[in-house]
Amino acid sequence: DVVQGRSLPRDRCRPLVVGDVSAMEYAAKAAKVVSGVDMKVRAIKAVSEAKYEYGVIDVYDMGIVKAADIPNDPEHPKPFGLGATALGGEAAFQYVKKVIELAMSGEVDATITNALSKEAINMADHHYSGHTEIYADYTKTSKYTMMLAHEELRVVHVSTHVSLREACDRVKKDRVLDVIRIANAGCKAIGIKEPKIAVGGLNPHCGENGMFGREEIEE
């Protein structure tokens, strides 16, 4: 999506990519073969070097993944052929860390992340369960959650990337109240003056007075 321009809304912002030029050049060649989209890649070492030209992707080059690390032939692309690797995990983690640093320093106004392989970043010895936890750690945020947004609907999680069994164990009154407060503040921050917040029950019919579970009663 990035190399085909679908993830670069130039009518609303001036986008640049934090990543590796070698990987983006490979992806651009593969995209041209697959879909005919011809995108150029420009390496930059500072945000101030970005030119934001149509048809060109400014890539803040991290220099982690080299051309020799990409064995696939762009004429016969196999974008998912490598699977999860420690190198891929290290690269992905460093990209996310860098965009956080750029945002915290005021060099960029907002960040957007692509899908992240949790398996890969853990293979690289970065023990996080997802973007949310990385952002929280590097921004020193103690109370946080994930919000999914689509038009008029916002969905906010009491738990994030954990097993279903652990998710049930995390449904505690204090945590639910924290998430409600975070959701309220988050909605207001994006322009919803009076958020209407519905809280889902853990059990069917919110436990039906204990018939299907007592969490709603005891918590």
Predicted feature descriptions by range:
Residues 7, 140, 160-163, 169, ...:
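A broad detector of the eukaryotic-type serine/threonine protein kinase catalytic domain
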Residues 136-149:
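FAD-binding core/adjacent interface of flavoenzyme oxidoreductases
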Residues 56-59, 146, 155:
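Conserved beta-strand scaffold positions in the cores of enzyme catalytic domains, especially
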Residues 14, 143-145, 154, 196:
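Proline-centered loop/turn at the N-terminus of a beta-strand
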Residues 148-178:
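Ligand-binding beta-strand-loop-alpha-helix segment within the catalytic cores
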Residues 84, 131-132, 140, 153:
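Short secondary-structure boundary micro-motifs
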Residues 1-131, 174-219:
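Contiguous, glycine/small-aliphatic-enriched amphipathic segments in soluble metabolic enzymes
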